[in-house]
Amino acid sequence: CIRDRYISFRAAAAIILALLIVIIFGRKIIDFLRRKQIGEDIRDLGLEGQLQKRGTPTMGGVIILLAILVPILLFGRLDNIYIQLMIVSTVWLGLIGGLDDYIKVFRHNKEGLKGRFKIVGQVGLGIIVGTTMWLSPQIIVREKVTQPVQTVYLNPDGSVIESVQRNVVLSSESTKTTKTTIPFVKNNEFDYGWLTGETSAATWLLYVLVAIFVVTAVSNGANLTDGLDGLATGVSVPIVAVLGVLAYLSGHIVYADYLNIMYIPDSGELVVFAAAFAGALVGFLWYNSFPAQIFMGDTGSLAIGGVIAVFALCIRK
């Protein structure tokens, strides 16, 4: 079965297929949206030439979602909890954004979906992600078990030269934790349990609140960048690439140990998702860069930001 092959092979297949989907179907979808006059009503931000983009086809996020979901359904391990979370997040926010675009375009309501309903949807996803990360037995980290060992250096006459104490790694164990990490910083682990005094209920509540904040903030942040040529996709591509590399390192026990970063079993599968995600964004950038032939609309921007947020939560970065 192709899903049992190496992650690198499946990631390469995912990024190629995502690019092909956008290239093959992108032009057809753009032409269809033009014929149906599904255009963008540009917000006037005072930028030169901005209002000339009024009428540019929107809802191009459908192309991105299609180019993400098809490769991951073909090449991803669907029994992996992280892949399940990413698929749910993509579809969930894609539907919310799609409903917003539908109201704007077909109901001719510039406001689109009420802001409170968007927030409710984002908060709901944050609760699902935070609760799953807390409760799922498949989501664990591997922590090193150390023991202090004291070494004493003696002179020939038996007098002490130096006494050195160091921690020796005895083994590693899988455990549930609310720790997160800051990449590229030494001693970078932070445990939310430290703030709540290790109280289980309070720690869970804090962890879910953090998940809600991250999902809502990043999703809305990405939403604000749409409407300018290539901005949302151009910013997102390097972010997804870095997250993909971090997922690969965090899911590889040898590299994680060598680089002294948190080892997260099964998180390496997220590399396949990141590859499909990056391929979809790069392909879409071809049509979205200046002069933009299509905008992703809320269908794409809400999903892109939310998926990036959930990805970062999954790899605890």
What are the functions of these language-model segments?
Residues 3-30, 64-95, 102, 116, ...:
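Alpha-helical transmembrane segments
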Residues 11-17, 46-55:
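Glycine-/proline-rich flexible loop or hinge segments
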Residues 29-52, 102-111, 173-185:
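Cytosolic, membrane-interface loops and tails of multi-pass inner-membrane proteins
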Residues 43, 47, 56, 64, ...:
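Short capping/connector residues at structural and topological boundaries
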Residues 44-53, 85, 108, 192-200, ...:
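Short juxtamembrane and helix-loop transition motifs at transmembrane-helix boundaries
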Residues 53-65, 117-123:
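Select subsegments of transmembrane alpha-helices in polytopic membrane proteins
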Residues 183-213, 219:
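Individual transmembrane alpha-helix segments
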